[in-house]
Amino acid sequence: MTTRQHTVCVIGAGPRGLSVIERLCAAARAAAPDTAIGIHVVDPHAPGAGQVWRTSQSAHLLMNTVAGQISVFTDASVELTGPLEPGPSLHAWAEALLAGDIPGHYPDQVLDEARALGPDTYPTRAFYGHYLRWAFDRTVAGAPDCVTVTWHRSRAVALDDEAVALATGHPPRQRVTLEDGEVLEHLDAVVLSQGHLPARPTAVEEQFAALAREHGHTHLPPANPADTELECVQPGQPVLLRGLGLNFFDYMALLTTGRGGSFTRVYGRLVYLPSGREPRMYAGSRRGVPYQARGENEKGPHGRHEPLLLTPARIARLQAARGTDGADFQRDVWPLVAKEVETVYYRTLLTARGRGDRAESFQRAFLRALPGTSAEETVLDAYEIGEKDRWDWDRLSRPYQDQEFGSPEDFTAWLLDHLREDVAEARSGNVSGPLKAALDVLRDLRNEIRLVVDHGGLHGDSHREHLDRWYTPLNAFLSIGPPASRIEEAAALIEAGVLHIIGPDLRVDVDRQGFHAHSPLVPGSRISAEVLIEARLPDITLSRTEDPLLRRLLDSGQCATHRIATRNGTWIYTEGVAVTPRPFQLLDAARRPHPRRYAFGVPTESVHWVTAAGIRPGVNSVTLTDSDAIAQAALGAVLEQRDSLERTAA
């Protein structure tokens, strides 16, 4: 073994950083067993879980993916360059834990959850954190003899080239400075694998927050609910939550069951029993209704919709267009996505009606019919699918569009019916239920859509207007929602008078008396509150980042925002960190790739699409293929440095 140790630094040790570390260990075992390699892991929180999945968070916070569809390990489906070294999914780990096959002592709460956990159960985030910490420990314990892993419980604040390259003509090695003053030197490669990061507010947001402070009101900015101090919210106090997505459900849980309330069933109906410590919650958003519930999983851990139209051949044709000739999402991609979703809906509807024998012939006929033409209507008529059962994207995205509300009571009555219907649809499953089977196609097609839109696959105007501002929020609303249990709980809280949904197109202002909100579509909906919670995560924004490392890299020209060419030859600048295609080398302000720096994950959103999605087993997870590519490149930098030094010494 070489006596000089070569080093890689991984900054950010949540699931993505963990995956890179695991892939580095696997690659070193196969390709460099005689080369001493040190892996520095930099994260102020325990590696594996990181901050978001830390084990100390409230047990009232749930994941929105079932246990059988969560992993951090490679499997036979993953198209790897490096070696395959499989490991258990979260559900398989829970089973092994109960069987006594997982070493270590775990709290009773963890063991109790493992006993209750099925493959289609939504685990707590803390439970996932225990799995991730175990996965890190397993990776370190099983690392080849040539690899040592060192955790630095601190935050990286600077990344620089070393002043002198050790070998002539070789790029300088790297130096990382930590918040506690420690300096990591002579690094052959650095991987940025951070997650959601704090961001400065926009000018409009800061003006609003300043007004709130001036009048002495409590304004809680966008944040992970697990990181938010809620002691300032008093029992019985009116509190306004702006946002009805996943963060809203987290706050809803923390302020109700998290304060001692409970749910029970009375004649089959869920009822909330208050503790008396809850605030009075008012909530709203532009769309005005909570995210759609996930359909109960009937696909097992690995099942997914196989593309009918977004096939590899079609994707290859779309990928051939780049830059100013990039694809147009609305013209080239959306019709294919919509057609796939609608086809699955109608096919499942026929099967649910007992006409499964006609489903295949329907699919062939419907796929041949051009979208939005009378040919589609003819097919639907031929298969006796009436108007009331026909797919309507507008009605799905704005389910209240045909309603008129005379009062908040009218809106609440309609909303409760809507929520109960959503729960019933979710209970029917993501294979058997026509609606949820169709909406699950949006989730299953994420990898295919990424292949088209990533790295400037769309022209800039389409990326901004069609993908960022239209499809991404629609996709989140329809397919990245909470478990059905959360929707049922929201309905019970509304009936208990603890939660009030204000209505669509939420308007909020602030004055000396407090925060005021109303829906222009719901007469009499104006409410006032003393506390406003922004129920969303901070923006993914490089230009306004408060992460000290990215801030310094940006200010010094060592990184840049991703840009996309428009049809008229100009650029649209996004808020994502600019990187090359795989292996995602960091680009500087002059758009030059750095041969020793790599970045992937949430901060690169807009280069990549939906970067927050987790690793799923059995479906060739893009996160695993990405981390494998980075690990191969980082190991390549190590071996190149080793060979160069050996040549110099000779």
From Swiss-Prot:
- The yes or no answer to whether the keyword NADP is present is yes
Membrane-traversing stretches: none
Alphabetized Pfam families for the sequence: NAD_binding_9 (PF13454)
Task: Identify the InterPro entries for this entry.
Answer: FAD/NAD-bd_sf, HpyO/CreE_NAD-binding, L-asp_N-monooxygenase_NS-form
Task: Specify whether Cell membrane is a keyword of the entry.
Answer: no
Name the cofactor(s) required for activity, per the record: FAD
Q: Which reaction does it catalyse?
A: L-aspartate + 3 NADPH + 3 O2 + 2 H(+) = 2-nitrobutanedioate + 3 NADP(+) + 4 H2O
Q: Which family does it belong to?
A: Belongs to the nitrosuccinic acid synthase family.
Which named protein is this?
Answer: L-aspartate N-monooxygenase (nitrosuccinate-forming)
The organism encoding this protein is Streptomyces davaonensis (strain DSM 101723 / JCM 4913 / KCC S-0913 / 768)
Starting at the broadest rank, the lineage of the source organism is: Bacteria, Bacillati, Actinomycetota, Actinomycetes, Kitasatosporales
